[in-house]
Regions:
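Divalent-metal-activated hydrolytic enzyme cores
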Residues: 1, 19, 27, 46, ...
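Extreme N-terminal starter segment of soluble prokaryotic enzymes
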Residues: 2-6
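Short, well-ordered beta-to-alpha junction loops that form the rim of enzyme active sites
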Residues: 11, 107-110, 150
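Short, active-site-adjacent cap segments at secondary-structure transitions
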Residues: 14, 48-49, 111-114, 153
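Short N-terminal binding/cap micro-motifs at the start of the first secondary-structure element
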Residues: 14-20
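Short glycine-enriched, charge-decorated loop/helix-capping segments at active-site entrances
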Residues: 22-23, 119-125
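Short, surface-exposed acidic-centric catalytic microdomains
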Residues: 24-74
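Internal, conserved structured core segments that host functional sites
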Residues: 103-118, 122
Length: 156
């Protein structure tokens, strides 16, 4: 891990910031990284969304499409929360750049953080290929983005 600095989803380090008010603690992250090797963020909270909040999914595209205003992040009540997701993505990018983060470890399947697979917008549990809004923005700016599972495969 030498020479790498990580931006990590706050929920993965035990912060109760998920939409349901819970965390997704991955103890191995805490065990394998020193506090001076990472900075944490929850893009959704940084974008102004509360804890807890209604579940949200990207409809008609993926995170890149949301950044291009060609798709929307809609919560389960039908509210368009795209602006908060975009604001949070830019907050994550700003934090990553300020700390010169080279890598991001972000929560799988999240409409903000996921890389590779996201929920399809139907709120039925179906997944499609695509990145979350924050993951897409970080990738656009040259960061290496991985899920917690990909990080664990790398270290175990």
């Amino acid at each position: 891990m030498a020479g790498k600095f990580y931006l990590i989803s706050a929920c993965l380090l035990g912060h109760k910031v998920r939409y349901d008010g819970r965390d997704c603690l991955v103890k191995e992250l805490v065990d394998h990284l020193l506090p001076d090797q990472y900075v944490t963020i929850c893009p959704e909270v940084s974008g102004g969304l509360p804890i807890p909040r209604p579940a949200a999914e990207i409809q008609s595209g993926d995170g890149l499409d949301v950044l291009l205003y060609q798709a929307h992040v809609i919560d389960i009540n039908g509210t368009d929360v795209s602006d908060a997701f975009i604001k949070g993505a830019y907050a994550a990018l700003d934090l990553a750049q300020r700390f010169q983060a080279t890598h991001a470890i972000l929560k799988a399947h999240s409409p903000s953080c996921s890389s590779k697979l996201i929920y399809d917008g139907s709120f039925t549990g179906n997944k499609i290929q695509g990145d979350g809004v924050t993951a897409a923005l970080l990738k656009q700016h040259g960061m290496e983005v991985m899920t917690e599972d990909e990080f664990l495969q790398m270290i175990l």
